[in-house]
From Swiss-Prot:
PANTHER family: PHOSPHOGLYCOLATE PHOSPHATASE
UniProtKB keywords: Carbohydrate metabolism, Hydrolase, Magnesium, Metal-binding
Family stated for the protein in its record: Belongs to the HAD-like hydrolase superfamily. CbbY/CbbZ/Gph/YieH family.
Pathway: Organic acid metabolism; glycolate biosynthesis; glycolate from 2-phosphoglycolate: step 1/1
EC number: 3.1.3.18
Organism this protein belongs to: Neisseria meningitidis serogroup A / serotype 4A (strain DSM 15465 / Z2491)
Protein name listed in UniProt: Phosphoglycolate phosphatase
Cofactor: Mg(2+)
UniProt lineage: Bacteria, Pseudomonadati, Pseudomonadota, Betaproteobacteria, Neisseriales
A GO molecular function held by the record: metal ion binding
NCBIfam families associated with the record: HAD-SF-IA-v1, HAD-SF-IA-v3, PGP_bact, PRK13222.1-2
Binding site for Mg(2+): D14, D16, D177
GO cellular component, as recorded: cytosol
One Gene Ontology term from the biological process aspect of the record: carbohydrate metabolic process
Amino acid sequence: MNAAIEHVQAVAFDLDGTLCDSVPDLAAAAEAMLEQLGMKPLPAKVVESYVGDGIGKLVHRVLTNDRDREADSELWEKGFVSYMKYYRDHLSVFTRPYPETEAGLALLKSLGIPLAVITNKNEILAAELLKQLGLADYFSLILGGDSLPEKKPSPLPLRHAAEVLGIDVANMVMVGDSRNDIIAAKAAGCLSVGVTFGYGDMTLLSQDDATRPDWIIGSLPEIYENLQPQKNKEE
């Protein structure tokens, strides 16, 4: 166990690829958008590789089938409107929490630790998705990619979350599946926890100091298992 875990006062989570598997609905929205624009569909695995930087960036990547290129502005605008319209209406058709998500959240909540969601997804969509999945009540704070002037990998959302929760950011844990989560956590000065069941490749990310998480877990209850002895000691 990382020594820093002894000082944890709040836990923040990424959403897509950490709390839930949302790719099926994200991919369905991409397929609907491409069909409306008269373009060929992309495999769900390709769409999965494009997730993590917000829907605006996802639309660019899907339209160009390239992680780094941007689509023509007029095409992007049409695509974005189409994507958002479909996705808003189909947020949780196939999206489900990962098997041990709710158990892990309930265990952490039992310790009296405030929980937050820090995602690059639009805040309204994130809040509605959590509500539809029955997870919203676990969280004291939900921050989306459009909640603040900067999003992950900027440390700003993490620092803001800590401020709202009334704790030092060094006493917060950021749990996620992507480089954005880990880079943001390191820049903010808090503990980074990588999950092995999401969309990011933790083995690959761990090879680089900049994206190596402080701790890797295979299920959310593992966080509780490490925090619970500490909380018992404090009592």
